[in-house]
């Protein structure tokens, strides 16, 4: 029962912060000077469409797997990958809804956020983890990658981040943006990387799960460092990028980005 409740909780929280129109996200992406491309990553009988952004750097770079929100691989999520590339990292954002749409399509074929939501709740957890591992393995083997891979996710993707680091010990760090943590103690005991949390102060439903995550991670001897950005709401990394976003969300987004980049720099 509890895992089902957590899934519903994640759904409700993600819905609360979504702006139906994200027209502001695409123009920035289209103006990017960096190399951006679509690739198809195959594992088993699955073809996963992934968005890859490359930095303009001299040396090999650390890679980041970006896990999308409940709305699928949107322009904003692709923009996050580009902004990570701007900061000097290779970013890969898999469309975990690949194959769920008409004619085997993914997010783009589902007709918007409602269509994505209707599919994402029924994705098998093991399939999601396998898709993420395939994306991680792909980017880690790129000639431009230095072999280091971190993972970060937003909302639903934040929850998936916790699960992924539990099942993929090679990850250097996990970044959970306003996602609930696992309460599966044996699963948490498998985590070998530090987990960093980013939460909005005005997000009581998700923040109510933080103490339990802290307790279980401490009991397991794992590193979990949550930070709450006061005044910000759920989804502040996206809402703070919206030109019409509140000052609190904008401030939290900027602080979140700075923290993320500082941690990545130290990996």
Which role fits each region the language model picked out?
Residues 202-207:
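Acidic catalytic loop of the alpha/beta-hydrolase fold
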Residues 218, 223-267:
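C-terminal catalytic histidine-bearing segment of alpha/beta-hydrolase fold enzymes
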Residues 170-180:
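A conserved short beta-strand
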Residues 153-157, 161:
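Gly/Ala-rich beta-loop-alpha elbow adjacent to hydrolase catalytic centers
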Residues 143-154:
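Alpha/beta-hydrolase fold nucleophile elbow
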Residues 191, 197-199:
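Short beta-strand/loop motif that positions the catalytic acidic residue
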Residues 5, 11-41, 48-51, 156:
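An N-terminal hydrophobic leader/cap segment in hydrolases
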Residues 29, 38-141, 238-242:
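Serine-hydrolase catalytic machinery in alpha/beta-hydrolase-like enzymes
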């Amino acid at each position: 029962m509890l895992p089902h409740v957590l899934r519903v909780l994640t759904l409700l929280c993600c819905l609360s912060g979504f702006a139906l129109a994200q027209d502001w996200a695409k123009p920035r992406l289209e103006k990017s000077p960096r190399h951006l491309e679509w690739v198809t990553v195959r594992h088993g009988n699955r073809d996963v469409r992934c968005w890859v952004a490359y930095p303009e750097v001299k040396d090999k770079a650390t890679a980041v797997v970006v896990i999308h929100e409940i709305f699928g691989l949107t322009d904003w999520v692709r923009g996050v990958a580009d902004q990570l590339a701007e900061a000097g990292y290779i970013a890969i954002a898999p469309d975990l809804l690949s194959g769920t749409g008409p004619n085997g399509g993914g997010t783009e074929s589902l007709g918007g956020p409602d269509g994505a939501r209707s599919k994402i709740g029924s994705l098998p957890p093991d399939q999601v983890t396998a898709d993420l591992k395939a994306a991680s393995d792909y980017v880690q083997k790129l000639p431009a990658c230095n072999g280091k891979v971190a993972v970060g996710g937003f909302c639903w993707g934040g929850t998936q981040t916790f699960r992924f680091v539990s099942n993929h010990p090679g990850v250097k760090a996990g970044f959970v943006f306003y996602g609930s943590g696992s309460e599966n103690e044996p699963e948490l005991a498998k985590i070998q990387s530090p987990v960093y949390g980013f939460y909005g102060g005005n997000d009581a439903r998700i923040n109510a799960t933080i103490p339990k995550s802290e307790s279980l991670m401490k009991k397991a001897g794992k590193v979990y460092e949550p930070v709450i950005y006061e005044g910000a709401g759920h989804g502040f990394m996206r809402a703070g990028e919206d030109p019409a976003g509140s000052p609190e969300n904008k401030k939290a987004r900027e602080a979140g980005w700075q923290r993320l980049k500082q941690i990545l720099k130290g990996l």
